[in-house]
């Protein structure tokens, strides 16, 4: 059962001090993300995608990719995931 706003003594509960009129404004850092951060973020996502596409299309004819075998998927997805995780820091 919900509690009423009046206490057992009959006096009303005190108002909280966190109302919008009592709050002081906080300055938010309005600087955007540096351009190099965005370039690295997009570059990693595209590099991961490119790695997977090249592995799929020509992986058997490229010697070092043939030696890596299934690790190519880990490398490609790893690069793409790092780029995607970087999007959380983008402003």
From Swiss-Prot:
Function summary: Involved in cell division.
Membrane-spanning ranges: 38-58, 68-88
Coiled coil: none
Membrane topology: Multi-pass membrane protein
Pfam family, one: CrgA
Region Disordered, annotated ranges: 1-28
GO biological process, any: cell division
Name of the gene encoding the protein in the UniProt record: crgA
Species of provenance: Corynebacterium aurimucosum (strain ATCC 700975 / DSM 44827 / CIP 107346 / CN-1) (Corynebacterium nigricans)
Protein name: Cell division protein CrgA
NCBIfam families found in the cross-reference section: PRK00159.1 (NF001194)
Alphabetic keyword roster: Cell cycle, Cell division, Cell membrane, Membrane, Transmembrane, Transmembrane helix
Biased composition regions of type Polar residues, renumbered to the chain: 1-24
Compartments reported by the entry: Cell membrane
InterPro entries per the UniProt record, alphabetical: CrgA
GO cellular component: plasma membrane
Family stated for the protein in its record: Belongs to the CrgA family.
Main location, first listed in the record: membrane
Presence of the UniProt keyword Transmembrane in the record: yes
């Amino acid at each position: 059962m919900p509690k009423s706003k009046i206490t057992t003594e009959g006096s009303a509960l005190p108002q909280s001090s966190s109302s919008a009129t009592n709050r002081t404004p906080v300055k938010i850092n309005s600087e955007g993300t540096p351009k190099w951060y965005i370039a690295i973020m997009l570059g990693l996502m595209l590099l991961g995608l490119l790695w997977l596409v090249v592995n799929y299309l020509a992986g058997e004819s490229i010697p070092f990719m043939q030696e890596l075998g299934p690790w190519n998927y880990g490398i490609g997805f790893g690069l793409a995931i790092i780029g995607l995780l970087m999007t959380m820091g983008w402003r």
